[in-house]
């Protein structure tokens, strides 16, 4: 080793002696200090040497290489290196020079002024580190060595049940394995069981245990650790994996039926003795352990709260299990184990709890009706909302064509058109209730016979309406005929008397005015002046034409004419309190040959109901037209006045 040091020293100092022209200042310039430091590292300068210090660091964390230098020591400089790399040069008062740029930002001097602090650790940082310490007034260099190990932080371990071996004594042997994700370097394990003295620190990740149904189902926990971290698993109860033990051949189990939302009791009918250790109820694979006060729970550390704690209880008298306010998830297998101090083989009783919902009223629907060759076919479907798969259906009248599908009952019905089809009743059943619904089949398929009956009934109704209408029409006509006869029998003068000039009137009364019962009034007569034969013949011809026109109009309207005076008619209408007058021009009632200047018209509205009528412009059954001819004011000779009679005025009452 001394020869090696001498060789490296000669190789380092040789070039300096071969260049006498270089001054001493040039030789010991600061630039040459760094190569000199590397040479000293390679030479392994003699000094005090100590065994390596092992340091553990967490991946991504930080470590401190502590030198533990006395405060009284005077340090010239410290060289830090990680062979074959030089890391840093540290001078007094925390002055540090980073020699490897790959460590920029990761290296700094700690609080004591000399120790090295490294952050953001990576896997490649693992290895050996050296510190060369040079003190003032000390000839030898002190070396200190460190060994750095980098570990990952452990994640939460998990317990895996690798195997379960059931036995005939209602017990199982379990093999548990504790696993941790990530690296497993230097990871050790330990196992604990709650409320027991089981504590294994052998470092094995495997545990083999045996447990009986009568043993308390206490949870197991696995703990894993390495030099930089530790973590524990969630507690695991292992009896839930012992499914084979509860399938042991015993006496036939009992089926108990419960109703959703109502209480149920699983009767054990057991009397405890001194030898009885405890009674364990198991639902599926969850253990329900009895407590002294009678409450039942699956885990003392996870007791249900509030009403849920009181929902499942065991009886203090016979250890029966009582469940209130049943839920659908309560259905399943239950096992009662009676454990004894004298025997390790407990007695067991099995129960099967079924939970059903009270059925609602079923609904019956029909498919579109299909008709072919006089055969009517339809499919009726009966279903219950929320009934589940345990619902059965029956049809009344009994039918053999019902088919169950997806919780519904489908009934195929076919019959000939016109055949009487009864109403169908669908009844839904389950073990705790039943409910029925009736479907009326009277209108689902109407055949020709039913259509014939329908049209016949409709025809009879129409005939009845026609008879009633005819009866009222005949009655009305009879009343009108009676009125016409009464007016025909009224007294009519043999010849129409002449009235003075400007006062001749002719009245027309409608046969519809049954209420207008006015007797004919005798008109006042005035002597008619004599005239010559030509004038009389002309007047007679004009009068005959006027009578013919008026009788023709009256006959076309089926009216009766009567000759009364204008004053008498007005007096009669005024007496009834039903008269209104309005000047109108009935163009469709008066001959157009008459001079408009010589005619005046009034409208008399008659309300046969006794109410005050409104003036009407349109002709109706309550209107009486009265026409009065004005006397012409033409100059006539005395002879013409004596011979020509005045053209009579007339009134038309309709």
Curated annotation (Swiss-Prot):
InterPro entries from the UniProt entry: CD2/SLAM_rcpt (IPR015631), Ig-like_dom (IPR007110), Ig-like_dom_sf (IPR036179), Ig-like_fold (IPR013783), Ig_sub (IPR003599)
Region (Disordered): 292-319, 517-557, 628-654
ITSM 1 (atypical), short sequence motif: residues: 599-604
Glycosylation sites noted in the Swiss-Prot or TrEMBL record: 68, 120, 231, 284, 390, 412, 423, 434
CDD domains named among the record's database cross-references: Ig_SLAM-like_N
Signal peptide: 1-47
TM stretches of this protein: 454-474
Paired cysteines (S-S): 172-242, 178-222, 376-445, 382-426
Domain Ig-like C2-type: 159-243, 353-453
Domain (Ig-like V-type): residue spans on this chain: 48-158, 250-362
Phosphothreonine modifications at: 499
Residues modified to Phosphotyrosine: 601
Annotated compartments: Membrane; Cell membrane
SUPFAM superfamilies, A to Z: Immunoglobulin
Tissues in which the protein is found: Lymphocytes.
Role according to the record: Self-ligand receptor of the signaling lymphocytic activation molecule (SLAM) family. SLAM receptors triggered by homo- or heterotypic cell-cell interactions are modulating the activation and differentiation of a wide variety of immune cells and thus are involved in the regulation and interconnection of both innate and adaptive immune response. Activities are controlled by presence or absence of small cytoplasmic adapter proteins, SH2D1A/SAP and/or SH2D1B/EAT-2. May participate in adhesion reactions between T lymphocytes and accessory cells by homophilic interaction.
Assembly, per entry: Interacts with SH2D1A and INPP5D. Interacts (via phosphorylated cytoplasmic domain) with PTPN11; the interaction is blocked by SH2D1A.
Protein name per its UniProtKB record: T-lymphocyte surface antigen Ly-9
Organism: Mus musculus (Mouse)
């Amino acid at each position: 080793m001394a020869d090696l040091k001498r060789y490296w020293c000669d190789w380092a100092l040789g070039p300096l002696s071969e260049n006498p022209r270089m001054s001493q200042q040039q030789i010991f310039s600061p630039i040459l200090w760094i190569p000199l430091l590397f040479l000293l590292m390679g030479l392994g300068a003699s000094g005090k040497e100590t065994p390596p210090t092992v340091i553990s660091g967490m991946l991504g964390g930080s470590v401190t290489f502590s030198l533990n230098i006395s405060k009284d020591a005077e340090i010239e400089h410290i060289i830090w290196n990680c062979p074959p790399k030089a890391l840093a040069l540290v001078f007094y008062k925390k002055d540090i020079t980073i020699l490897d740029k790959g460590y920029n930002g990761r290296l700094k001097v700690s609080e004591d002024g000399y120790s090295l602090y490294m952050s953001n650790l990576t896997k490649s940082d693992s290895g050996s580190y050296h510190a060369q310490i040079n003190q003032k007034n000390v000839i030898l260099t002190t070396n200190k060595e460190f060994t750095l190990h980098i570990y990952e932080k452990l994640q939460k371990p998990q317990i895996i049940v690798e195997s379960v071996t059931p036995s005939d004594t209602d017990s199982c042997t379990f093999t548990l394995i504790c696993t941790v994700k990530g690296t497993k370097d230097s990871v050790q394990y330990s196992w604990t069981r709650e409320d027991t003295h089981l504590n294994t620190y052998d470092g094995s990740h495997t545990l083999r245990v045996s447990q009986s149904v009568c043993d308390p189902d206490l949870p197991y926990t696995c703990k894993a650790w390495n030099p930089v971290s530790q973590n524990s698993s969630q507690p695991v109860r292992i009896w839930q994996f012992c499914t084979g033990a509860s399938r042991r051949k015993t006496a036939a189990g009992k089926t108990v039926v419960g109703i959703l939302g109502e209480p149920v009791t699983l009767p054990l009918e057991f009397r405890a003795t001194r030898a009885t250790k405890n009674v364990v109820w198991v639902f599926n694979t969850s253990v329900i352990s009895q407590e002294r006060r009678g409450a039942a729970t699956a885990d003392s550390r996870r007791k249900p709260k509030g009403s849920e704690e009181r929902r499942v209880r065991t009886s203090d008298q016979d250890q029966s299990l009582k469940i209130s306010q049943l839920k659908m998830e309560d259905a399943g297998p239950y096992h009662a184990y009676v454990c004894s101090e004298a025997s390790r083989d407990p007695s067991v009783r099995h129960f099967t709890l079924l939970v059903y919902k009270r059925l609602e009223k079923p609904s019956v629907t029909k498919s579109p009706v299909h008709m072919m060759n006089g055969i009517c076919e339809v499919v009726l479907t009966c279903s219950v909302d929320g009934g589940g798969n345990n619902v059965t259906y029956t049809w009344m009248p009994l039918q053999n064509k019902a088919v169950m599908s997806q919780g519904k009952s489908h009934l195929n019905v076919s019959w000939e058109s016109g055949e009487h089809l009864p109403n169908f009743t669908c009844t839904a059943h389950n073990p705790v209730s039943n409910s029925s619904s009736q479907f009326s089949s009277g209108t689902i398929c109407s055949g020709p016979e039913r259509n014939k009956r329908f049209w016949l009934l409709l025809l009879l109704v129409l005939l009845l309406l026609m008879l009633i209408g005819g009866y009222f029409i005949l009655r009305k006509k009879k009343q009108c005929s009676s009125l016409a006869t009464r007016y025909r029998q009224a007294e009519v003068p043999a010849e129409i008397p002449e009235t003075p000039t400007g006062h001749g009137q002719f009245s027309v009364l409608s046969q519809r005015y049954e209420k207008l019962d006015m007797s004919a009034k005798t008109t006042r007569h005035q002597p008619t002046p004599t005239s010559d034969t030509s004038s009389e013949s002309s007047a007679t011809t004009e009068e005959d034409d006027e009578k013919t026109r008026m009788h023709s109009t009256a006959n076309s309207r089926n009216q009766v004419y009567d000759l009364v005076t204008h004053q008498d008619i007005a007096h009669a209408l005024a007496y009834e309190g039903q008269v209104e007058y309005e000047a109108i021009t009935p163009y469709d009632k008066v001959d157009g040959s008459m001079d408009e200047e010589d005619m005046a018209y009034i409208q008399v509205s008659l309300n046969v109901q006794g109410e005050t009528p409104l003036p009407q412009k349109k002709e109706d059954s309550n209107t009486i037209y009265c026409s009065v001819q004005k006397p012409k004011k033409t100059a006539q000779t005395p002879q013409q006045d004596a011979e020509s009679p005045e053209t009579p005025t007339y009134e038309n009452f309709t």
